[in-house]
C-alpha cells in the first residue's frame, strides 16, 4: 500500500523475514524482469533485486523513491521511476512479472490496468481479503470482466501484524495468471456492455423471453445465481447469435 495519496494509509511490511516469506510464494526467478507497484521504503525491492534479472520500481512519492534508491544501493539491476501507476505505460516488447503491495482504495483500478493494459503473465499483489474474494465472484461485474483474461488465486494470508501500522482488515497475497483470452478483442466492448446489464438483471433488455429460455437451456443452467465461467460465456455467445 505504497502509492501515496492524502486519503491513503501507508501500511508497510518491514520485517525481512515476512518479506522473504511472502516472496517465496511467488515464482519470480533470476530470469525475470519485475515491475514493482509502490516500492515504498524498498523492503520488497531489496529482495526482488536479488531474486530477479531486473526491477523497475514505480513509486508516486518522491521522498520514498529516494528511500528506495538508498535501500537497494549499490545494486545496478534496478530502475526507480516516480510516477502514478495508473498513468504508467507498461512495456510492450519485453516479458515481465508484476509485484505490488497496493493501496486498498485504488485496488480495482490497478487490477483493471494490469489485466487490460499490461502483458504480464503473472502478477502478484497483496490486497484486502474481501477484495480478493470479489475478484473471484462471478456474480459481480469485475469478476466477470477479469475471468476472460485471468485466473485469480489466493496464495497466502498476510495477517495485520505483518504491517506497520496494522490495518483493520485481513490481507492476502494473490496471483493473477494470464491465460488465452476467452473472447476475441472485437467482442470485448459488446461483452463489457453485456456484463453490466446482466449483473443489473436487465435480462429483458438483452433477450426476448424465448431467447432467454433458449440461452439458459443451451448453457445447461439450473440456477441462474450460480453460473460457471463456461455457462456465462455460453449465454453471452447465445446473445451474440441473437444480435
Curated annotation (Swiss-Prot):
One of its GO terms (biological process) is response to antibiotic. Pfam families: RrnaAD (PF00398). SMART domains: rADc (SM00650). One of its GO terms (molecular function) is 23S rRNA (adenine(2085)-N(6))-dimethyltransferase activity. It catalyses: adenosine(2085) in 23S rRNA + 2 S-adenosyl-L-methionine = N(6)-dimethyladenosine(2085) in 23S rRNA + 2 S-adenosyl-L-homocysteine + 2 H(+). It comes from the Bacteria. InterPro entries: KsgA/Erm (IPR001737), rRNA_Ade_diMease-like_C (IPR023165), rRNA_Ade_Mease_Trfase_CS (IPR020596), rRNA_Ade_methylase_Trfase_N (IPR020598), SAM-dependent_MTases_sf (IPR029063). Signal peptide: none annotated. Its EC number is 2.1.1.184. Keywords: Antibiotic resistance, Methyltransferase, RNA-binding, S-adenosyl-L-methionine, Transferase, Transposable element. GO terms for cellular component: cytosol. Belongs to the class I-like SAM-binding methyltransferase superfamily. rRNA adenine N(6)-methyltransferase family. This protein produces a dimethylation of the adenine residue at position 2085 in 23S rRNA, resulting in reduced affinity between ribosomes and macrolide-lincosamide-streptogramin B antibiotics. This is rRNA adenine N-6-methyltransferase. It comes from Staphylococcus aureus.
